[in-house]
Regions:
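Short coil/turn segments at secondary-structure junctions
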Residues: 1, 125-128, 189-193
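Basic Arg/Gly/Lys-rich low-complexity intrinsically disordered segments
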Residues: 1-2, 19-21
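Compositionally biased, low-complexity flexible segments
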Residues: 1-14
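Non-catalytic nucleic-acid substrate-recognition regions in nucleic-acid-modifying enzymes
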Residues: 20-162
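C-terminal edge-of-domain segments
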Residues: 164-177
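SAM-dependent Rossmann-like transferase core, predominantly class I methyltransferases
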Residues: 175-213
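Conserved class I S-adenosyl-L-methionine
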Residues: 216-221
């Protein structure tokens, strides 16, 4: 979808289109085998169902709105993150990947004084090096900013302001923006990890699988 033109001045965030009611493509990763429970949870939290939900192993795609993004980040027990898809296209070479990333209006989402990192996952990808694929995305982001403003954001692997996710699936590539920041199992309440900590998302998945906790309605019959 088209994005309004926006620029970041100094360290300020751009005016993002968060209040618009346009449809967004979201991906919610989860532990393998948990995706059906996650689909039920998303349905219970947002009302999304049918063609608005696509279940895959290790996550679900959802067609939602910004209000759904906020609600899922706040209330989801099972999702690891809430990712917003900004681009998806056939991509069989590093040059094609660079061109895809260069077309994304990153300046609508963050500015030159913000830091970012690129994480990459793959399933059946033809790319020889995932690290090089991530590097090409970093180059494209930096070059786009430099072309438009004469400056570029810095890469920061630890606690960046922005996380970009690159997913390579066969001959296709997706670029997604992380709306969650820290993984959703890190809610900030745990003071002591203990000897064998259990991730909150995994604990919730175990409860869902046991039948102890059931959403009010199922998204998938």
């Amino acid at each position: 979808p088209a994005r309004p033109a926006a620029r970041a001045a100094g360290g300020a965030w751009p005016t993002m289109p968060c209040m618009s009611d346009e449809a967004l493509t979201l991906f919610l990763p989860c532990a393998a085998g948990v995706q059906d429970f996650l689909a039920d949870e998303v349905h219970g939290l947002t009302g999304l169902a049918g063609q608005d939900l696509l279940i895959e192993r290790g996550g679900i795609y959802a067609r939602g709105r910004w209000r759904d993004v906020m609600r899922l980040n706040l209330h989801s027990r099972l999702a690891q993150r809430v990712l917003l898809e900004l681009a998806h296209a056939p991509c069989e070479s590093e040059d094609a990947l660079y061109a895809l990333a260069r077309r994304v209006p990153w300046e609508d989402w963050f500015g030159t004084r913000h830091t970012f990192r690129v994480d990459v996952t793959a399933r059946g990808s033809a790319f020889k090096s995932l690290q090089f694929a991530a590097l090409r995305v970093k180059d494209a982001v930096a070059d786009r900013f430099r072309e438009r403003s004469g400056a570029r954001p810095s890469v920061q692997t630890q606690q960046p302001d922005v996380r970009i996710h690159l997913h390579l699936d066969g001959a296709h590539a997706s670029l997604l923006l992380d709306t969650s920041g820290e993984p959703l199992f890190k809610r900030g309440w745990r003071q002591d990890k203990g000897d064998a900590p259990l991730k909150e998302t995994l604990a919730a998945a175990m409860l869902a699988a046991s039948g102890w906790w059931q959403p009010a309605r199922r998204a998938v019959a």
